[in-house]
């Protein structure tokens, strides 16, 4: 049914009362008075809902850790209506068949809209599924992925021809092998995967003749080059001096406090392009003993709420959060989300800046919600709208899984 959503929308860099009409899940008009039409009033400050371009929801193959139902439910509770899932499953998503099998398992289970990456090995661009939202390259080994040592020029040309964005796990394998050692705490893990491995990867990625490339989860402000830079809340807010144990073990590692604080300063100064969660859950057994614990931190539900608390404290400008967590991520992939604009999906989140809470891991919706952010200040959205449908109402989930698969080029086809 056509209707207008009415409230104080974040529009052109400020909050203003607007009546936003929606037809078939898409914004049709933006007015002060929408006229004779059914209205739904949204409380608080109304922002476009967010996009997280970097999650690991573990479907298929490791659903004891997470599945798309629990992962996507966590996403919408955190104000995120589109997630992009990584390809490092037990059976890596390297070709059409693996991609189709994964999509078949996920369809009908996701609460948020979703897109899927394929893994780039340096020689497989001809056989990856054309619906892949992008390609992921692991320059250094990580969970379920060996390091890809190089992308030949001919492969880069093919990637450009197919129009793929490439996102890099930016730790160079040769450097990681050089520094490999036993680690029994966060400090030792940091030293075993030092910043120099990211710097080496940055030099390589910057040299590649790729039209669209992203360096994932940058952990130090010195890591820069001819690419977009993604940053995560855990590298912004946590460091290796905190008593987090294996819950804080992640790749790239949490850095020392000085590096973490400089990274946060760079982010709040507007020096980064993308804010993602790198949501990567593991079982209690996987995290039991630090030396053998698997790397990964959950964060899809807390990514935006943690940053909203920084906005309230006047540490972070809302516009920086808006650009990095909401507007820019979908725009990189040609997806019409993240703006209050005609022709964009009607995805909104309502924020009550007076309702700040402590993160309580027992109330998170991930399958195994042990969070390194437990006890930190956060502001969760009270209401979330996805394509004109209210999916979170007064902090409660009220919808069935309505998530839609978003293949590469989907929004081009709708023009």
From Swiss-Prot:
Which organism is this protein's natural source? Thermoplasma volcanium (strain ATCC 51530 / DSM 4299 / JCM 9571 / NBRC 15438 / GSS1)
Identification of the protein by name: Dihydroorotase
Q: Which reaction does it catalyse?
A: (S)-dihydroorotate + H2O = N-carbamoyl-L-aspartate + H(+)
Protein task:
Catalyzes the reversible cyclization of carbamoyl aspartate to dihydroorotate.
A GO cellular component annotation here is: cytoplasm
Cofactor dependency: Zn(2+)
**Record's cofactor remark:** Binds 2 Zn(2+) ions per subunit.
Family as reported in the entry's similarity comment: Belongs to the metallo-dependent hydrolases superfamily. DHOase family. Class I DHOase subfamily.
Q: Name one GO biological process term.
A: 'de novo' UMP biosynthetic process
This entry's Gene Ontology molecular function terms read:
allantoinase activity; dihydroorotase activity; zinc ion binding
Per UniProt, which keywords does this protein have? Answer: Hydrolase, Metal-binding, Pyrimidine biosynthesis, Zinc
> SUPFAM superfamilies, from UniProt?
Composite domain of metallo-dependent hydrolases, Metallo-dependent hydrolases
What would be the name of the gene that encodes this protein? pyrC
Q: Cite the active-site annotation.
A: 278
Gene3D superfamilies (UniProt xref): Metal-dependent hydrolases (3.20.20.140), Urease, subunit C, domain 1 (2.30.40.10)
Query: For binding Zn(2+) 2, which residues are annotated in this chain's numbering?
Result: 136, 169, 217
Q: What class of enzyme is it?
A: hydrolase
Pathway(s) it belongs to: Pyrimidine metabolism; UMP biosynthesis via de novo pathway; (S)-dihydroorotate from bicarbonate: step 3/3
Q: Which Enzyme Commission number(s) are listed? A: 3.5.2.3
Where N6-carboxylysine occurs, residue numbers? Answer: 136
Query: What residues does Zn(2+) 1 bind to?
Result: 54, 56, 136, 278
Q: What is the lineage of its organism?
A: Archaea, Methanobacteriati, Thermoplasmatota, Thermoplasmata, Thermoplasmatales
């Amino acid at each position: 049914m056509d209707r207008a959503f009415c409230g104080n929308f974040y529009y052109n860099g400020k909050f203003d009362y607007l009546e936003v009409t929606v037809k078939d899940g898409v914004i049709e008009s933006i007015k002060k008075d929408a006229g004779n039409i059914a209205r739904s009033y949204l409380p608080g400050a109304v922002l476009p809902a967010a996009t997280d371009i970097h999650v690991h929801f573990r479907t298929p193959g490791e659903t004891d850790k997470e599945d798309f139902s629990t992962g996507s439910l966590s996403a919408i509770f955190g104000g995120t209506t589109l997630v992009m899932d990584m390809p490092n499953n037990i059976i890596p998503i390297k070709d059409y068949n693996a991609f189709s099998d994964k999509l078949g398992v996920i369809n009908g289970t996701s609460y948020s809209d979703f897109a899927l990456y394929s893994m780039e090995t340096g020689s497989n661009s001809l056989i990856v599924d054309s619906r892949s939202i992008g390609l992921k390259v692991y320059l250094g080994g990580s969970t379920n992925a060996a390091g890809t040592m190089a992308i030949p020029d001919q492969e880069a040309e093919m990637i450009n021809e197919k129009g793929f964005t490439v996102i890099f796990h930016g730790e160079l394998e040769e450097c990681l092998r050089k520094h490999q050692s036993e680690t029994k705490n966060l400090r030792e893990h940091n030293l075993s995967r030092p910043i120099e491995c990211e710097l080496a990867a940055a030099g390589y990625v910057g040299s590649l003749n790729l039209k669209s490339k992203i360096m994932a989860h940058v952990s130090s402000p010195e890591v820069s080059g001819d690419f977009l830079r993604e940053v995560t809340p855990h590298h912004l807010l946590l460091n290796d001096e905190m008593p987090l144990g294996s819950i804080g073990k992640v790749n790239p590692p949490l850095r020392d406090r000085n590096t973490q604080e400089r990274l946060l300063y760079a982010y709040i100064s507007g020096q980064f392009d993308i804010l993602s969660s790198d949501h990567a859950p593991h079982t209690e057994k996987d995290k039991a003993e630090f030396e053998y614990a698997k790397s990964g931190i959950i964060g899809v539900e807390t990514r935006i709420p943690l940053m909203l608390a920084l906005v309230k404290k006047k540490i972070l400008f809302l516009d920086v959060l808006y650009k990095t967590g909401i507007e820019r991520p979908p725009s990189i992939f040609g997806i019409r989300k993240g703006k209050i604009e005609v022709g964009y999906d009607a995805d909104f989140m309502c924020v009550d800046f007076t309702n700040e809470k402590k993160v309580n891991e027992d109330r998170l919706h991930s399958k195994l919600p042990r969070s390194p952010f437990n006890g930190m200040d956060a502001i969760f959205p009270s209401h979330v709208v996805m394509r004109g449908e209210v999916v979170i109402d007064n902090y409660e989930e009220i919808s069935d899984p309505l998530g839609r698969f978003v293949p590469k080029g989907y929004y081009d086809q709708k023009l």
